[in-house]
Amino acid sequence: MRQKESAGLLLFRWNGPELEVLLGHPGGPYWSSKDDGAWSIPKGGIMPGEDPLQGAIREFTEETGFAADGPFIPLGSITQRSGKVVYAWAVEGDCDPTKIVSIKTTTEWPPRSRRFIEIPEFDRVAFFPIQDARRAINVAQAELLDRLIGEIDSGQRAEGRGQR
């Protein structure tokens, strides 16, 4: 796995005229009381030799239990505070957030205790209107919301549709 790189998908949908995005809340005791700035796009490590988009699709399915079908809109990359580079794509789609099936991971808890617990990658996912997503999402990933809006705006102008 490429240690400092990950890839993910930003699923979006229209709720009437309002754009909404799907974000996931990390599982486990460390994150249980954190909300603002804790949510993330479904993403994860890129396997050796794996195409980043294929990694993003795989991670989306592993972390949510949902399939994502293209077309995929490239959003470029961002660098998180940890130094990790995240490659992201947007995809329009819908799902029922109450039906999440997230893979589990093992983590040491409490830290340095040598005790390990199994936790879900995400304990829940939800659709957020863009304004609420800005508050909820990891600060470094907020740029992906702006890029999504830019892609939607430029696509609508190219098709002569104006605002949705």
PLM region spans:
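N-terminal strand-loop-strand
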Residues: M1-S40, W89
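Short, charged/polar surface micro-motifs in flexible loops or helix N-caps
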Residues: N15-E18, G28-W31, M47, F66, ...
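A generic structural signal for short hydrophobic patches within well-formed alpha-helices
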Residues: I46, A133-R134, L145
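Active-site-adjacent beta-strand/loop module that shapes the phosphate/pyrophosphate-binding cleft
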Residues: I78-R114, A126, L148
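Alpha-helix-centered segments that form part of catalytic cores
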Residues: R115-Q131
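C-terminal/domain-terminus segments
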Residues: Q141-G155
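Short, basic, low-complexity termini and linkers enriched in Ser/Thr/Gly/Pro
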Residues: D153-R164
